[in-house]
Amino acid sequence: TVYWFNLLIPTRRPLIGNCSQYGHGVFGNDGDHNLVQSTAYIASRVWADADGDDRVGAVMIQNGQVFTSREVQKADARPGGYIAYGGHGGIVGNTVEDPVLSFVPVARHTHTSALTLDTLPRSVPGIHGSPVETVDGDGHLLPSALPKVTIARYVNYGQDDFSDSADSEVEILARIAKNLRDHPLSGIVAEGSAPYGGVYESMRAALLQAVFRGMPVVAVGRGGGGYAFGQSTLGGLLVRGSNLSAPKARILLMASLLKFGALPVPVDPDAPTAVELDAIRSKVAEYQLVFDTH
């Protein structure tokens, strides 16, 4: 949720998420303490640049640690149960005493994001070519526009056979069919090998079926620390998901779909021409720029 706000809300002020792992009033409740430390973070202005604008982006403050929203993940239901995951770090400061920052993220955020609500087009193309309205006249996001993005996971020795046919990837094929019926803005995050983002041949074929039907696919690794390699894009037809974890890549793809819409669909999705493939690569490049900078 905090990462979603980080991408869409164009605020120049600090945006902080908190969680209480124990209920309010319970002995050892950490929620109240997290709120107090967040207030101290705001008052300290360590987040401000020379112009007084937020230079960090949305953060989560838990148990004295300041996490960037891009790289925080819940690992356990106890105090201290949030960890840095994805990226290379994630903890940028602490609030144990006076709030301090040790690092400032370079990823675009809040008022520097390319995906803020005030920059979204009123409509984008859906997978069937018809426009999908994204915001109303007041600039509010329409619930009906929220994209459907799911995660397909690679597991070693998981394929049914050694065929490179998509036929055995029944989960991905069923999701493609459901998206075509019900979700004009949709995509898939492919969580591949660690850290390279590779998948086996039949899964690759199924993911390309999604791409050729207008659904962008983002390749990430399951390791949570390394970058997906260039070869995971299958020649520029998939988006390389940087060093994002699969859940965060899902959030970024949802926001990007509201900005760019569906990929161009070939006349015959099972036999795209060279010109149609180039058109897909051109659209994927727009997504890639966002994933490289957010």
Which residue stretches match the model-derived regions?
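C-terminal non-catalytic interaction/assembly regions of soluble proteins
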Residues: 176-181, 186-294
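Solvent-exposed alpha-helices and their adjacent loops that cap or buttress functional pockets
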Residues: 7-11, 16, 28, 45-54, ...
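Short beta-strand segments
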Residues: 16-19, 59-63, 153, 191, ...
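Accessory alpha-helical/coil subdomains and C-terminal extensions
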Residues: 68-195
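Acidic, glycine-rich active-site loops and adjacent beta-strand->loop/helix elements
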Residues: 19-24, 64-66, 194, 223-225
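Short Gly/Thr/Asp-enriched flexible loops that form oxyanion-binding sites at enzyme active sites
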Residues: 1-12, 199-207
